[in-house]
């Protein structure tokens, strides 16, 4: 039983790498966009925060499933 629980947590840890990389790419693109066009900062910020929330939701769903299963 304990081995199954540990395997679930290891699986979640590996699965969390994807959203982590995705969030990094989202904010890298945001910073690059603001550096190119500072006047579009407010519009780009809203899009970046929405992208962050969607990517983070994947990680939250993953940890919920790791605890349930």
From Swiss-Prot:
Entries under InterPro entries matching the protein: ATP_synth_csu_bac/chlpt, ATP_synth_F0_csu, ATP_synth_F0_csu_DDCD_BS, ATP_synth_F0_csu_sf, ATPase_proteolipid_c-like_dom, F/V-ATP_Csub_sf
Keywords per UniProt: ATP synthesis, Cell membrane, CF(0), Hydrogen ion transport, Ion transport, Lipid-binding, Membrane, Transmembrane, Transmembrane helix, Transport
Keyword Membrane tagged: yes
Its membrane topology: Multi-pass membrane protein
Localization annotation: Cell membrane
Cellular compartments per GO CC: plasma membrane; proton-transporting ATP synthase complex; proton-transporting two-sector ATPase complex, proton-transporting domain
Gene Ontology MF terms in the entry: lipid binding; proton-transporting ATP synthase activity, rotational mechanism
Cytoplasm as UniProt keyword: no
Pfam families linked: ATP-synt_C (PF00137)
Site features described as Reversibly protonated during proton transport, chain residue numbers: 56
TM segment ranges: 9-29, 49-69
The protein's assembly and partners: F-type ATPases have 2 components, F(1) - the catalytic core - and F(0) - the membrane proton channel. F(1) has five subunits: alpha(3), beta(3), gamma(1), delta(1), epsilon(1). F(0) has three main subunits: a(1), b(2) and c(10-14). The alpha and beta chains form an alternating ring which encloses part of the gamma chain. F(1) is attached to F(0) by a central stalk formed by the gamma and epsilon chains, while a peripheral stalk is formed by the delta and b chains.
PANTHER family: ATP SYNTHASE LIPID-BINDING PROTEIN, MITOCHONDRIAL, ATPASE PROTEIN 9
Protein family (similarity comment): Belongs to the ATPase C chain family.
Known function: F(1)F(0) ATP synthase produces ATP from ADP in the presence of a proton or sodium gradient. F-type ATPases consist of two structural domains, F(1) containing the extramembraneous catalytic core and F(0) containing the membrane proton channel, linked together by a central stalk and a peripheral stalk. During catalysis, ATP synthesis in the catalytic domain of F(1) is coupled via a rotary mechanism of the central stalk subunits to proton translocation.
Protein name as annotated: ATP synthase subunit c
Organism: Nocardioides sp. (strain ATCC BAA-499 / JS614)
Phylogenetic lineage: Bacteria, Bacillati, Actinomycetota, Actinomycetes, Propionibacteriales
Gene this protein is translated from: atpE
